[in-house]
Amino acid sequence: MFTPRGFKFAGVHCKIKRKRKDLGIIFSEVPCVAAGVFTTNVVKAAPVIYDMEILKKNPNGIKAVVVNSGVANACTGEQGMINARRMAEKTAEELGVPVESVLVSSTGVIGVQLPMDKVENGIEEAARVLSNDPLPFAEAIMTTDTKVKMHSTKVMIDGKEITVLGIAKGSGMIHPNMATMLSFITTDAKISEEALKKLLKLSVDDSYNMIDVDGDTSTNDMVIVLANGLAGNTTIQPETDGFWKLYEAVHEVNQVLAEKIVEDGEGATKVMEVHVINAPDIKSARLIARSIVSSNLVKTAIYGEDANWGRVIAAAGYSGATFDPEKLDLFFESEAGRIKVAENGQGVSFDEEEAKKILSEKKIRIILDMKQGKETAKAWGCDLTEKYVEINGRYRT
């Protein structure tokens, strides 16, 4: 795993959770240009509200992010805002940085106040054990996740080697437009605030906003990107060659992390990748792809290895996109093969046993050819199983 210049990480167990690490810090030796994308849920957790304000005031001076897991600090009223600010203050004190240079994030159970004595002790410990290793931080932000989610890459811009590292968490309450997922992207690229905001928005639209586990949109989601400029490249501006090179690197990281989140979906046994091709416009393609991966009937059909193609067509139909349903061709595909199940909006004769064999694989592709244009979109989701109900039925116990 590559680590960008000037960044350090820590993850500790401060006893919010029974056993696993539950508090982490990312620290940059120099101020970062920062940008964020946050939950679309009207009910926003205190850290989300706090960070949105900080990024308005100080987008060019961020030095740290502090994250706790186990308690979401959502639906916690005025005390929740006080606690979010106190997390930033304590982190600033321990790191010797301005309070307005610290972002805050929380994930876990909604409606519970943070145990601030434990949190503050955890911040003290984390500040003492900062290192170049991002793994402890990745472990500290997990909730129902079964595995850490990290990815890094390098790119050459202006003759300078630039590193991008992403660390994410997410397993349940994942739905298009950002849900119970946190993602922190660090890079040593030098980039303007305007360019970073644009780059992040473009990437999120085609990565985290195109995944679904269970259709629930969380109160706490955020994607934060920090760029500290220590690579020494010329400052990247929007729409330049350097911009697109960095975009490709950041987007690779975001797409890999988005897929890792889906693969780790609560109770999931299969991943489905929906390809909408030859759509009339990009908006329609995205709407339809999202609708299909979000459909519980499609998810359960995939789990049951049932080629119930009508559920896919129906999900496209209620997506909000306008199209001609009599032109749709539909295919199921996996490493075991490919089969056409519908043509021009109607079912075709196919071998049910062959279809079941294709759907028995761990990764399933659903390909909807609209034959009405040239635009394409991809979305990722997972099946819906009894295990999901079991995990979420006992989440607070």
UniProtKB/Swiss-Prot annotation:
Any one GO MF term held by the record is: L-glutamate N-acetyltransferase activity
Family statement drawn from the similarity comment of this UniProt entry: Belongs to the ArgJ family.
Q: What is this protein called?
A: Arginine biosynthesis bifunctional protein ArgJ
Q: Which GO terms describe its cellular component?
A: cytoplasm
Q: Which residues form a coiled coil?
A: none
- The UniProt annotation places substrate binding at T143, K169, T180, E266, N392, T397
Its subunit composition reads: Heterotetramer of two alpha and two beta chains.
rRNA-binding in keyword set? no
Q: Where in the cell is it found?
A: Cytoplasm
* Residue numbers marked as site, Involved in the stabilization of negative charge on the oxyanion by the formation of the oxyanion hole: T107, G108
EC category name: transferase
Origin species: Thermotoga maritima (strain ATCC 43589 / DSM 3109 / JCM 10099 / NBRC 100826 / MSB8)
* Keywords recorded for this protein, A-Z: Acyltransferase, Amino-acid biosynthesis, Arginine biosynthesis, Autocatalytic cleavage, Cytoplasm, Multifunctional enzyme, Transferase
> For the site Cleavage, which positions are given?
A179, T180
Q: Does the keyword Kinase apply?
A: no
What does the record give as the reaction this protein catalyses? N(2)-acetyl-L-ornithine + L-glutamate = N-acetyl-L-glutamate + L-ornithine; L-glutamate + acetyl-CoA = N-acetyl-L-glutamate + CoA + H(+)
A UniProt-annotated Pfam family: ArgJ
Q: What InterPro entries does the annotation carry?
A: Arg_biosynth_ArgJ, ArgJ-like_dom_sf, ArgJ_beta_C
Q: Which residues form the active site?
A: T180 (nucleophile)
